[in-house]
Amino acid sequence: MANKKIDHREEAVELLKQDAKRILQLIKVQMDNLTLPQCPAYEEVLDTQMYGLSREINFATRLGLIEPEEGKKLMSTLEKELSTLHELSMSKK
């Protein structure tokens, strides 16, 4: 095996960022094609995805892979991006 040291911290942060990006993309597709933001199905998908990401962040924090502040920042950034997306969607309709 090569002498390649795996940096689990960087890997954890990158995976969490990818999941946040996936959630943003999922919600964007849903807003563009399927439902209105006031729709219960939309809200349920958003709540479920955000809850899942928060649990992933909590798990990574408990393992010491990310700092609590980094997890809070990731959630806050995603919430701001989703809010902006929501505002843009509402202004188009």
From Swiss-Prot:
It comes from the Bacteria. Signal peptide: none annotated. Pfam families: DUF1507. Transmembrane segments: none annotated. Belongs to the UPF0358 family. This is UPF0358 protein lmo1070.
